[in-house]
């Protein structure tokens, strides 16, 4: 089976003084999260679409989905304390409600990347069915500088650098085995789901993203996103 998992567990602290997590803020006439869910409901190959959100916001999430979304494949799941616990909460839901077969895959995506295209979703599905793990990236435009203690320690070759986006897609059993193989210290250091597999020695394939598949994190991002929606309408 092919699952989608929309990670909506963030608190949105970098958005500033706002009354709710950023995924629930309005973008034009509806919440950011709804824009994202709609993109995934267009893909008929998904057997289920999980929206994983903070426990305190489950009722709100269910209410807005009921208002805007009619697709019965969409289910709300309680997330965890951080990104990767939220990811694994979705995996546990799949295990409990559907069982997990050897060829089951999951396409995971940030709730606050509402401009994902059907091409990116399709490329993730095709790639993850052929590979064990897939990351969506765009080539780095600016030079990447590594530093410590206010000093430059390395300047990697830019042509080898990419900026990570989502979706990040996985064979579910490989993801579970990779996560369980990590130490507590490794799990605590995770800032990216694909790192679960790379730390466990699994190869991660690349899918080309798009510059406008950006993450709405700050007030500036929200203004840019609002301008894009207005232009498209």
From Swiss-Prot:
It holds the Pfam family IspD. Keywords: Cell wall biogenesis/degradation, Nucleotidyltransferase, Teichoic acid biosynthesis, Transferase. Transmembrane segments: none annotated. It catalyses: D-ribitol 5-phosphate + CTP + H(+) = CDP-L-ribitol + diphosphate. Disulfide bonds: none annotated. One of its GO terms (biological process) is poly(ribitol phosphate) teichoic acid biosynthetic process. The record marks 158, 215 as: Positions ribitol 5-phosphate for the nucleophilic attack. It comes from the Bacteria. Gene3D superfamilies: Spore Coat Polysaccharide Biosynthesis Protein SpsA, Chain A. The record marks 14, 22 as: Transition state stabilizer. CTP binds at residues 7-10, 80-86. One of its GO terms (molecular function) is D-ribitol-5-phosphate cytidylyltransferase activity. It is an enzyme of class 2 (transferase). Its EC number is 2.7.7.40. Pathway: Cell wall biogenesis; poly(ribitol phosphate) teichoic acid biosynthesis. PANTHER family: 2-C-METHYL-D-ERYTHRITOL 4-PHOSPHATE CYTIDYLYLTRANSFERASE, CHLOROPLASTIC (PTHR32125), RIBITOL-5-PHOSPHATE CYTIDYLYLTRANSFERASE (PTHR32125:SF8). Belongs to the IspD/TarI cytidylyltransferase family. TarI subfamily. Catalyzes the transfer of the cytidylyl group of CTP to D-ribitol 5-phosphate. This is Ribitol-5-phosphate cytidylyltransferase. It comes from Lactiplantibacillus plantarum (strain ATCC BAA-793 / NCIMB 8826 / WCFS1).
């Amino acid at each position: 089976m092919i699952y989608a998992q929309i990670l909506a567990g963030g608190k949105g602290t970098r958005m500033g003084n706002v009354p709710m997590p950023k995924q629930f803020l309005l973008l034009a006439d509806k919440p950011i999260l709804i824009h994202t869910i709609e993109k995934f409901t267009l893909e008929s190959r998904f057997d289920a679409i999980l929206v994983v959100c903070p426990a305190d916001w489950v009722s709100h999430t269910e209410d807005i989905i009921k208002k805007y979304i009619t697709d019965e494949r969409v289910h709300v799941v309680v997330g965890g304390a951080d990104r990767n616990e939220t990811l694994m909460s979705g995996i546990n839901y799949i295990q409990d409600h559907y069982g997990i077969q050897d060829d089951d895959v999951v396409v995971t995506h940030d709730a606050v990347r509402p401009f994902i295209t059907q091409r990116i979703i399709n490329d993730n599905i095709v790639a993850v069915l052929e590979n064990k793990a897939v990351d969506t990236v765009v080539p780095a435009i600016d030079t990447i500088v590594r530093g410590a203690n206010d000093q430059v320690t390395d300047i990697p070759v830019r042509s080898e650098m990419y900026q990570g986006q989502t979706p990040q897609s996985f064979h579910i059993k490989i993801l579970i085995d990779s996560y369980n193989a990590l130490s507590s210290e490794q799990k605590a250091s995770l800032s990216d789901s694909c790192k679960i597999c790379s730390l466990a020695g699994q190869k991660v394939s690349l899918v080309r993203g798009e510059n406008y598949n950006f993450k709405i994190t700050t007030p500036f991002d929200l203004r840019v996103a609002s301008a894009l929606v207005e232009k498209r309408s």
